[in-house]
Amino acid sequence: MKQISCFIPYASKEQADKTIRALETETEVHDVNRVETSLFRTQTIKEIAAQATAEYTLIYTKETPLRLGYLALQRLIRIAEDTGAGLLYADHYQVRDGEEQKAPVIDYQSGALRDDFDFGSVLFFNTKALKESAEKLTVNYRFAGLYDLRLVLSLSYELLHVGEFLYSEVEEDCRTSGERQFDYVDPRNRERQIEMEQACTEHLKAIGGWLEPTFESIDFGADGFETEASVIIPVRNRATTIEAAIRSVLCQKTAFKFNLIVIDNHSTDGTTEMIDRFKDDERVVHLIPTRNDLGIGGCWNLGVQSAACGKFAVQLDSDDLYKDEHTLQTIVDAFYKQQCAMVIGAYQMTDFELNPLPPGIIDHREWTEENGRNNALRINGLGAPRAFYTPILRRITLPNTSYGEDYAMGLNISRRFRIGRIYDVLYLCRRWGGNSDAALSIERLNANNVYKDRIRTWELQARIRMNREALKTTE
């Protein structure tokens, strides 16, 4: 039974013919349509929805050949009929440099608001759901049309991950995860990002998760702190980088007293001995946890809960350096000037010898006072260096993980408090083969993305509840 209308991007006859022929041989395919305009334009989405005549609609998003698995379309139809889902997407294979590799994807959550969420290249829609959702698209986007569609679709239908390998595609972007992770802050993508933010903002308003730009005030009068600021460095097995990181802290010139708290998480490579070289400097506090179950977030909590921690807790990763001796003073000044619970600066990507690397300066200029904390639910990070007002940090605490813990804290703080921004470079982020996120496996990348999406889901739920409670008090 022919139940599927197919739509494929058409750049040239040579490019599209192979996929067209493959689809036309499938007994479930009703018609194959060439799409000559961008699939990311709202107008294109509306045209596809209008042209789709079969019960289901398959949109293929790549211009490289598609090879369907054995009875793959039958399987998608069966699951679609059983579940009533609005969109199905599946695990698949990718051909990279001539080699076929597994490319599993992850489940969709309400907090999976990233515009780069990986659905794969085969999107299998219930046509009724597609048409209903396309009719609700009110903004004519150039870049965010497909993103807007899935946000609108998710309001009424399930977006269902089929955990089976149902097709093969050719992957042309062979960069590592470490190279791809900064695409969203690349200035060349700015126009696209503006549209994505607008679409996400409208979605948050539709579900009651958008926050107005009103913030709780901060009282910096908390006493009991012997120092104004503490730099926090969690570290494990970074003997080659920790000394330079420590020295970049100790050279800071400030008008206040500060210290450095290094949480040495049971290093075995000489890192402990390297830190001990600074034991005669009273500013250096060397903590070794008594327990063995701490991630980076847990190490941060240990340092922040320490009596030695100052009024402000400032980040420095053990791989990285402060740009100059004024970084700490600049950050602390920003707390008082901007009246915020958290301050985030800008950083420069470099190699180990401090030569600049693309994309260069990461300053998150997409952040605005009016909408920054809402857009934070869409983007994959908030920037660095990060600094916190210690009483608030102690009250909330970071998750005891080694990925996403800082992002979770930033989202939580931004729910109620202002986040301050410094757009000058304060920090040098050194990329090298030892970085934990330099080139992640697909399994590790998926696990990271699932966790960050879960963080967003929890935060979104908290914001929706907060808005509902606020509404009750005004009724």
What kind of feature is each model-predicted range?
Residues 19-30, 247-257:
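Short, acidic, metal-binding catalytic loop of nucleotide-sugar glycosyltransferases
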Residues 96-121, 359-379:
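Short, flexible, basic/aromatic active-site loop/helix in glycosyltransferases
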Residues 70-102, 326-359:
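Conserved donor NDP-sugar-binding/catalytic core segment of glycosyltransferases
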Residues 11-15, 37-39, 65-66, 264-274, ...:
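A conserved acidic beta->alpha catalytic loop
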Residues 3-13, 26, 229-241, 245, ...:
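A conserved hydrophobic helix/loop-capping motif in glycosyltransferases and polysaccharide synthases
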Residues 140-149, 402-409:
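Acidic donor-binding loop at a coil-to-helix junction in glycosyltransferase catalytic cores
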Residues 39-52, 290-308:
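Glycine-rich, basic loop-to-helix element that forms the pyrophosphate-binding segment
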Residues 54-67, 310-321:
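Short beta-strand-to-loop acidic/aromatic patch adjacent to the donor-nucleotide binding site
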